Amino acid sequence: MTVFLSFAFLAAILTHIGCSNQRRSPENGGRRYNRIQHGQCAYTFILPEHDGNCRESTTDQYNTNALQRDAPHVEQDFSSQKLQHLEHVMENYTQWLQKIENYIVENMKSEMAQIQQNAVQNHTATMLEIGTSLLSQTAEQTRKLTDVETQVLNQTSRLEIQLLENSLSTYKLEKQLLQQTNEILKIHEKNSLLEHKIFEMEGKHKEELDTLKEEKENLQGLVTRQTYIIQELEKQLNRATTNNSVLQKQQLELMDTVHNLVNLCTKEVLLKGGKKEEEKPFRDCADVYQAGFNKSGIYTIYINNMPEPKKVFCNMDLNGGGWTVIQHREDGSLDFQRGWKEYKMGFGNPSGEYWLGNEFIFAITSQRQYTLRIELLDWEGNRAYSQYDRFHIGNEKQNYRLYLKGHTGTAGKQSSLILHGADFSTKDADNDNCMCKCALMLTGGWWFDACGPSNLNGMFYTAGQNHGKLNGIKWHYFKGPSYSLRSTTMMIRPLDF
């Protein structure tokens, strides 16, 4: 603004200096217009003209108060007047400039205020638009950030849950791993102990094997010697058995002779007394008992369809008496490993071990209905029995098949004899239902069926050697399949006794 005013003042002075060469237009009315352009603003200044010519009156040229010099006096007065005039003009211009400056300042204030107000309004609107846009963008970004934050939180929650689950799984796995490690350590310790024990056992086992080898060699030598002794004993036993059979036959012949002599004496006494009674034969021990003979012993019976009488042992003491003994084992003195013919006709002594004979058993049980009772005794002194209400066997063509009904007794809840019918087998007559030939494997003659749960005609074993013997005297449901009994007795009695 100061530069502008200085420029205006300088222009006014120059204009005044050159006023002598200018003309006033009659239209201007004695005024002069000066227009100044400053930026976008244009300012017009109206300057008043001085009345009269540029020169002062001649009276002023000769003012007595003017300074005088050595130069011509007329020119000095003119210069003084001119300076005074210029000073006066300068004062006027100064006043006008002050007015102009005041006017400009006032106008500039209002214009600047208006400009500032417009600028502020424009800036405010722009700022409002920018602020609105920023608020919208901020809200949108906030919403997006909220969504992202929600997603991040959800993902973080999932990750935290997964992390917790993984932590739990890891903890469980670590716990299981520790347990398994402890178990492995315990197993390792046990294995170490077991290995140590195994080493010790191997050493002991080697020592025992060496001892057993020595004992085996000694036993083999002993077995060889015993085998030779047994063979010699068998030979002697066979010879003794042959001699015993001869003696038994001689004894039977003597008993028959004595019996005949007794009968003859009885007949002679009756004839002498004038009384003659008809002799009544006994069919079995029941008839003997009913005839008044109640003492156990050997009696002669007459069996239907048999050509000769038969000596039998009658048990008159057990369960009412009247029992005909058909089989008895007690001491192993008689060999029961015999053939078909011997089992057919019987063998042994009725007062000891013997077998009555299948043909005689068939003949007796064909006379009437009989009950079978089997008495058993083990090596511990325990007695038991099995009883069958109905008992009979078939003829030789039927292989002396066994028929039984109605089992009772104390020698097992089940029958050790085959109830549905089994054929009799011996070492030379295999009639069983097994491909193994039970009579050869189990010894003796019996109703084996498929080797079955019983064999009372098996090998006799003494005390201490009677265990684990499948071919012994066995009754399965009393003492098991491999226990050999001490004594057995098979006897029959009429059902209606």
Swiss-Prot record:
Pfam families with a match to the protein in the record: ANG-1, Fibrinogen_C
Coiled coil residues, start to end: 153-261
Entry protein name: Angiopoietin-1
MF-aspect GO terms: receptor tyrosine kinase binding
Protein source organism: Bos taurus (Bovine)
Role: Binds and activates TIE2 receptor by inducing its tyrosine phosphorylation. Implicated in endothelial developmental processes later and distinct from that of VEGF. Appears to play a crucial role in mediating reciprocal interactions between the endothelium and surrounding matrix and mesenchyme. Mediates blood vessel maturation/stability. It may play an important role in the heart early development.
Glycosylation sites: N92, N122, N154, N243, N294
Localization per record: Secreted
Keyword Secreted belongs to the record: yes
Domain of life: Eukaryota
Example GO BP: angiogenesis
InterPro entries: FIB_ANG-like (IPR037579), Fibrinogen-like_C (IPR036056), Fibrinogen_a/b/g_C_1 (IPR014716), Fibrinogen_a/b/g_C_dom (IPR002181), Fibrinogen_CS (IPR020837)
Gene name of the encoded protein: ANGPT1
Keywords: Angiogenesis, Coiled coil, Developmental protein, Differentiation, Disulfide bond, Glycoprotein, Secreted, Signal
Subunit relationships: Homooligomer. Interacts with TEK/TIE2. Interacts with SVEP1/polydom. Interacts with THBD; this interaction significantly inhibits the generation of activated PC and TAFIa/CPB2 by the thrombin/thrombomodulin complex.
Signal sequence bounds: 1-15
Disulfide bonds: C285-C314, C438-C451
Residue ranges constituting the Fibrinogen C-terminal domain according to the UniProt record: 276-496
This protein's GO CC annotations: collagen-containing extracellular matrix; extracellular space
PROSITE patterns: FIBRINOGEN_C_1, FIBRINOGEN_C_2
